[in-house]
Amino acid sequence: MNQTAVTTEIHAADVQLAQARISATIAPTPLQYCPRLSHLTGAEIYLKREHLQDVRSYKIRGAVNAISQLSDAQRAAGIVAASAGNHAQGVAFACRSMGIPGRIYVPAATPKQKRDRIKVHGGNMVELVVTGANFDEASAAAHDYAEETGATIIEPFAARDTIVGQGTVAAEILSQLSAMGKSPDTIVVPVGGGGLISGILSYLADMSPRTAVVGVEPAGAPSLNAALKAEKPVTLDAVDPFVDGAAVKRIGDINYQIIEKNLGRLHPLVVSEGAVCTEMIELYQNEGIIAEPAGALSVTALSELKLGTDDIVVCIISGGNNDLLRYAEVVERSLVHRGLKHYFLVNFPQEPGQLRSFLSDILGPDDDITLFEYLKRNNRETGTALIGLQLGRASDFDGLVERMNASRIDCRHLKPGTPEYEFVVS
C-alpha cells in the first residue's frame, strides 16, 4: 500500500501537530554556536546537531510521525521501507518501539555500520534485505514487496507524513533561536530526495518567510539541480554513492512541488565530494563531531556563500552514521581535493640509479612518496611505476611538474575523474 499523499499543502500547524505527536519518542537536538565557522565566515554560525538523535539522524522524525498514524489494520499487515541507511534506522526504531513488524531494503553500497545499526534498532521486529546497486533499485524492490503483501510503505522522503515530520527540525530551530532573542537569516540544508528541505520550506513559509534556505547537494548526485534546470523531476543516469545519505537519482515528486512553490527563498548549491571530505575532517578535529558525508554537506557550503557580518546562519548536521573504516578514503579524497595528493605513471629507464635520480632531482624537500608500485620487465628499455606523492603545499605542484618535464624520466600525471585515474588509483 503506497502512502504517498494527495496534497502538497503543508502548513506550520501540520508540523506543530507532528511535533506534539513525536515528542514522547524524540527529544530536541542541540543548536550549538560554532566559534570556528563564525570566525571563518564573519557571520554567526549555529550547528543543528541532528546526528545526536538516537539513530544519529533527523530521519527518525519523519519515520516516527508516519508510523505513529497507521491504523490497527495497517500495523498488523506490517510495513516496508527502502533507504540508504538513515531512514531505515528510523523505521527500525519505530517498529521495535511500537511492536510493528517491518521489512527494510537497503542498497549494496550501504555502509556496514548502517546495516548493523538497523539490526540493533529493529531487533526481532525487522528483517533487513540488501539489494540493488543504489537507493532507487532498493526502493523498486520495496514497492514490489508492498504490492505483493499489502504492507504499508513508509517513504524516506516522497510522502506528506514524512515531510511533515522532517519539518519539525525547522520548528525546533526557530524555537531555540527565539529563546536567545534571535531569528535565522539563512538555514543551510542537505538535499538528497528532498524530504528535509521541503519540510523546512513549508514551515518557514508560515513562520519565518524572510529566512533564506540553501539546499546543498553533492556533485555526484545533483538531483534537485537537474530538476530545477528541467523544471520537473528528472532521473539522473548515475550517481556517485560516496555521499550515501544524499545519493538519490531523482528528487521526490511531492518534494519538488513544494520546493517549486518556494523558489524565491531557495538557493541551490552543489559541492564536491572532496570538499565534503575536507569538512568532515575539520568537524572531527575541531568540534569533535563525527559527521557522515551527507551530514557535512551544509557546513561545506559555507565557503561558497556570501554572508553578512550580522547574519545568523544555521547549518544542519543531518547525520553521523559513518563507518570509521571509510576514513582512509575520506582523508584520501580530501588530500586530492586540496591539491596535496597526486598520482603519476612514471616510465623509468631500466638503468641503475634512475630511482635515485627521481628522488634527488625531481622530488622537493617536502614531497613524500605514499605509493610505489613497480614491475621490472626483461628485454624492455623502460619500466612503468605507479607513484603517489603527497606534497607539503599545493603550490609545490607547479615546481614538481617543471622538474619532471626537465628530466629524461617520462612522467604522466593522472587527473582525478579521468578513466585512467579511476582504473589505476580508485
What residue ranges belong to the model's regions?
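PLP-dependent amino-acid enzyme catalytic core
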Residues: 1-426
